[in-house]
């Protein structure tokens, strides 16, 4: 099974509106809003303005859960040695999971506003980013990206 099975079940069942408090967009880059952190995971509401994207990147050891709360987003999957596998279109309500055994990914927003929920475990991982076949160093999380920290634990009520 997946390394985040319990959290995956919770996120799949989540249909609340409390994330809308963090629905704020930026013209420069996607906006990462930290809404929960504990010893097991950190949770972000990420707001994507038109045509914003991540670099190709990896994840912390237990992986990442992504749920689309509004809009839709393209997810490109790559092998660990950065060979393209496929592109998936994630629409509102869709949940996907990735870890480093599955490979790397790049998230690309189209010409629309999108809001997504991301769970990473363990927390505070500084992802590795890749360009082509080349590893470009640590510090993906918040390095040149709009990184916003909120003290709210809005998801604790959902058992995370």
What do these predicted regions represent?
Residues 90, 105, 117-123, 132-135, ...:
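Acidic, Ser/Thr/Gly/Pro-rich intrinsically disordered interaction regions
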Residues 15-17, 128-153, 158:
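Asparagine/serine/threonine-enriched low-complexity, disordered tracts
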Residues 65, 111-126:
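A short hydrophobic beta-strand segment most commonly corresponding to one strand
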Residues 50, 61-79:
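Glycine- and acidic-residue-biased ligand/ion/polar-headgroup-sensing regions
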Residues 55-61:
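Histidine-centered catalytic micro-motifs
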Residues 1-20:
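N-terminal leader/capping segments at the start of a protein or of a new domain
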Residues 22-52:
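A short glycine-rich, His/Asp/Glu-containing loop-to-beta-strand
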Residues 65, 77-109:
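Short acidic-glycine-tyrosine-enriched beta hairpin
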